[in-house]
Structure formats: C-alpha cells, structure tokens
C-alpha cells in the first residue's frame, strides 16, 4: 500500500511452515515514544532471536510468514498483509495510525517497517487478546505460538449492519433463487475494509453448471462449486437480475479460496464466525412465501419468525447478528426461551424490518446446515487454476475407514510454479498430508512424491493450502498433486464429482485424470473404476511474473 487508509481486513487460516530472519527497523505510525527504554538485555535477546530465526504456530500448525520479526521489546510483529492471510479477523488502521482489532482500540499496535515503508506491521502480542488468541513465547525453543482461547466470551448482542455497510435487500420475486441471493449476500459481508460490491445472482444461477432452472431451488453446495471454480462472482451491473440473460464470458472479480461448514445447531460457533468473518448462510423452513403472506409462525409487527415443526428447510437466508435477550413474547407463538438470530432475507425491503427479521434460537432448522466464506482473495492471487470438478462436492469415496489417498494429474500450460492446492474436508477434524510429483510419467510416478506439508482442519469445508516451496513446472509437462486425508467418523473422506442425478448430469468425466489409493502405493483410476472426478485443484503462478 502506498498510502495508509482506513480499511477492514478479513483473514483466513493457512497451514504451512517457515523461518524468519533479521531484526526489524520500525517506527510508530502515531503516538509518543515509550517513556521507559527497553533494557539492553531484552534488545540483545531480540537481536539474537531474529538472527537465528524462530517459528510461529497457530493452534499447533506451523505458519510460513517470511517477514515476521521480534521488536526490541520482544513483541511479535507480523506484516499486516500476512495477518490478513492467516488469522481471520477484522483489523482497521486509520490515517493517523490508530489501530482497531475486532473493534477494540489498541494503542501503538501498528508500525511502519522503515526498511520497506509500504509495509505495515501489527504487534500480535498486543492484538492476540482482541482476536481471542493466547500468545506464548518459548525462549529455549525459539518458538512463538498463538492459540484460540477456550471459552471466549461472546457479546449478548451483535448486528453486522452496525460495523459495516451492507447492500440493500433485493427481491427474488417468483424465482427459486434464494440460495444464490443468500450466497452472494453472505459473500459480500466478508469483503475487506470498507469495500462494497454487489455480486450477480443471475450469473451464479445461470452459470452454475447444474441442470436447474431459475424457478427451481438450490443450495450452498452449488454456490460453492461455482465460486471455487472461479466462474464467479461477477458484478450485478454486468449481469443484472431477472432479465433471463447472462454473459458466460464474464470473469470473476474475486477468488474464493475457503469456506467452512459449521457444526449443526452450534449457536455459539455461528456467533463467533459472524463476529470474526461476516454473515453465515443457513437454511430454514418458511411457512410463508413472500412479504405479503401470513402464517401462525410469523409475527409481522415485530418481524419475528419461529417454526417448531418437522418440515425440511425450503429457504436460505444470511445470519448477520443475534440478540440473546430478544423476548420470546415477540413471536406469534412463544418458544421456551428468549434469544434470536437476526437474518437477512431476499424478499425485498417490504418484508420484515427493511428486509431483515428475527428467528428464534429454537427454530427447528436454522443453524442445522450453515456455511461461511472465510477466504476471499483478489484475482491476482494466482495465475492459473487446474481443475476437473466444476460441480464440486457431489458425493464421497473411500475405503470404509477414515483415511485414503487421492491424486489428480494435470498438464502445465506454461513455465509455472506450483503455489497451492485445494480440496474438501467432508467432516470435522480432518488431518492431511500434501505431496506433488512435478514430473509425472505414469502411475508408477505416484510412488515417489515430494512432501509439501501437513495440517489440520477443525471444520468441514473447502480449503486452499498454500505451498512455501518453489516447485517448478515446465510448459507441457505433466504433474500430479496428491493428498493423504484422514477425517474422523468418516468412511469415505474423499469428495468427488459425478453424474449422480439429473441435477449433476453435466459432470464431465473426460476432463480429469484422478487416482485413489488405500495405502499410497497401489492406485486405481477414479474415472475408470468409479466413474467420478476428484475434487482436488492446483493453483500456479507464471515464472515470468515472479520477476516483473
């Protein structure tokens, strides 16, 4: 950045490794220098730590942050750009150097690195509590750690509209496009800083690849497949809603690289994710069909809804806040306890309170199936994407046990560097090991892969793992990416795409070359033996762009 402006930054967890060197030269962006000088011993210790290098782990996983440093006072300093990438929080740095983390003002927590004036450093020792993290330093091991605090207290009330501007609530009309309205709206809430974009619903519904019309419904898995494949999002102004037309040549204005599936009925987790990232997309059963409809479950006077029956969900919304003290008496038939989520609908501003309404914590469906988009990158994050699963996660494959191996083979389109790999965790508590074969010459090549790293995903979801190594790929050469995955309580831990029904009849098995294995030694073709593509993408940067 050439000028420091007020902005919010949304961050995502990445599991990689690294070593950092040299002491930083920094100055405060604003404020008076400390009156008490740091002792010579502490300053000398910081020099020694920076010269020898140290490690940082997040919840037990080593991170790769190249320009991380210790200050002369032995405080952990991390570049703001890496805080964006790795930690998942809202950070604002003002024009005068004021720093707000999760809405909390932190004095002298933002610095300019004088070796590189455009680089802003954040004091993570000071910022950790505001992020719900506990910071520790092990001097003997030269190891810093940041771990999620247990039992972090959440506020009793939160409304995302009070912390950032949201687009006006639109009306889906008679179409069954609530899923796309909810997905695009949820995505808009995780944009960084004061950035406000209006994403196209039409483009998502008409370019999803699924065999479905606008009058039919969908779900967030369809939206995720569209976003993860970089077909979108595009701007509403370039593909407006409801005109029956779309432009398939439009390119994405953001790149989605991560989404997490939240635990069923874990209300505290939903709250924590809203506070940390933005809106949570979820589903519920609506016994009304539009803003002018009525039922015993909806109280229009208080814009309150509570359904206690056994019907399955038929509508998607975005949860943007909550009120633990929201009175049970506000509902047309009272639940047992107070408390409700604040939800954004897609029935226009005529519905509820300007398009928003409260749903009781005790609603039968809300919170059972929820997703949050946790890493939304700029479009220059990578140069290339290699994939064969345009419909995303349709089913699962495995060997009736938690572990399995899977690999996809691609052909490099240019002289490139392999920078990242993405795949799904089909359930919570997933560990993984990542490998690659840079010069693939046949199935036997899979027996000698290059180890790239390992990590852990607490939640099911779609994840991108960045690769610190400079793994070179030659134009026209074939390469393979490989994952050993272990998911607790799963007998089929591999996410696959296949023509399971009319909805997914468009799955193209001719564009993929995937292999699965029980032990990493004996491999079989996913397409030939199982009639599926593997959900395993690769991302590259062009070699020439590294030196521009």
Regions found by a protein language model. Give the residues of each.
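Primary recognition of N-terminal secretory signal peptides and signal-anchoring hydrophobic helices
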Residues: 5-8, 18-156
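Short, surface-exposed tryptophan/glycine-enriched loops
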Residues: 268-274, 463-478
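Extracellular interaction modules
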Residues: 115-119, 138-145, 365-368, 475, ...
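N-terminal secretory signal peptides that target proteins for export/translocation
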Residues: 1-2
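Short, surface-exposed beta-strand/loop patches at domain edges
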Residues: 484-548
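Surface-exposed coil/turn segments at beta-strand junctions on protein surfaces, enriched
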Residues: 71-73, 115-117, 275, 336, ...
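Short beta-strand segments enriched for Tyr within beta-sheet-rich domains
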Residues: 421, 477-483
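Catalytic-core signature of thiol
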Residues: 149-419, 424-459, 492-498
């Amino acid at each position: 950045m050439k000028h420091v402006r007020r902005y919010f930054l949304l961050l995502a967890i990445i599991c990689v490794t690294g070593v950092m060197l040299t002491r930083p030269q920094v100055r405060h962006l604003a404020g008076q220098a400390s009156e008490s000088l740091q002792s010579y011993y502490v300053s000398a210790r910081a020099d020694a730590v920076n010269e020898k290098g140290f490690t940082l782990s997040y919840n037990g996983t080593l991170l790769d942050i190249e320009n991380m440093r210790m200050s002369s006072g032995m405080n952990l300093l991390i570049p703001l750009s890496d805080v964006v990438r790795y930690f998942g929080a809202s950070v604002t740095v003002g024009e005068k150097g004021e720093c707000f983390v999760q809405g909390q003002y932190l004095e002298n927590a933002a610095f300019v690195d004088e070796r590189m004036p455009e680089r802003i450093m954040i004091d993570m020792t000071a910022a950790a509590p505001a992020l719900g993290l506990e910071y520790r330093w092990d001097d003997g091991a030269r190891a810093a750690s940041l771990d999620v605090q247990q039992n972090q207290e959440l506020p009793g009330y939160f409304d995302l509209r009070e912390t950032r501007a949201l687009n006006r609530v639109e009306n889906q009309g008679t179409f069954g496009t609530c899923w796309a309205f909810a997905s695009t709206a949820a995505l808009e809430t995780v944009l960084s800083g004061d950035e406000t974009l209006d994403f196209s619903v039409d483009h998502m519904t008409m370019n999803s690849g699924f065999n479905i019309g606008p009058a039919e419904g969908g779900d967030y898995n369809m939206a995720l497949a569209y976003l993860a494949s970089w077909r979108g999002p595009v701007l509403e102004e370039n593909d407006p809603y409801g005109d029956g037309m779309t432009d398939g040549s439009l390119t994405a204005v953001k790149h989605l690289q991560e989404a997490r599936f939240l635990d069923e009925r874990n209300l505290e987790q939903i709250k924590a994710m809203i506070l940390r990232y933005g809106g949570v997309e979820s589903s519920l059963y609506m016994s009304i069909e539009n803003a002018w409809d009525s039922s015993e479950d909806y109280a229009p006077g208080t814009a309150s809804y509570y359904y206690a029956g056994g019907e399955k969900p038929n509508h998607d919304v975005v949860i943007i806040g909550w009120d633990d003290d929201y009175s049970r008496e506000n509902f047309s038939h009272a639940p047992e306890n107070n408390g409700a989520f604040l939800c954004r609908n897609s029935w226009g501003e005529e519905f509820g309170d300007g398009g928003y309404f409260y749903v009781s914590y005790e609603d039968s469906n809300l919170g059972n199936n929820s997703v949050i988009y946790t890493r939304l990158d700029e479009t220059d994050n990578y140069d290339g994407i290699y994939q064969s699963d345009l419909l995303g996660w349709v089913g699962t494959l495995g060997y009736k046990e938690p572990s399995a191996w899977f690999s996809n083979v691609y052909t490099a389109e240019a002289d490139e560097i392999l920078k990242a790999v993405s795949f799904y965790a089909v359930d919570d508590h997933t560990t993984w090991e990542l490998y690659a074969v840079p010069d693939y010459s046949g199935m036997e090549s899979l027996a000698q892969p290059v180890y790239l790293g390992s990590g852990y995903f607490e939640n099911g979801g779609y994840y991108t793992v960045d690769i610190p190594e400079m793994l070179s790929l030659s134009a026209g050469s074939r390469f393979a990416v490989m994952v050993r995955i272990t998911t607790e309580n799963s007998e089929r831990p591999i996410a696959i795409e296949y023509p399971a029904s009319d909805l997914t009849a468009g799955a193209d098995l001719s564009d993929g070359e995937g292999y699965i294995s029980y032990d990493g030694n004996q491999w079989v073709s996913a397409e030939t033996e199982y009639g599926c593509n593997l959900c395993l993408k690769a991302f590259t940067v062009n070699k020439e762009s590294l030196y521009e």
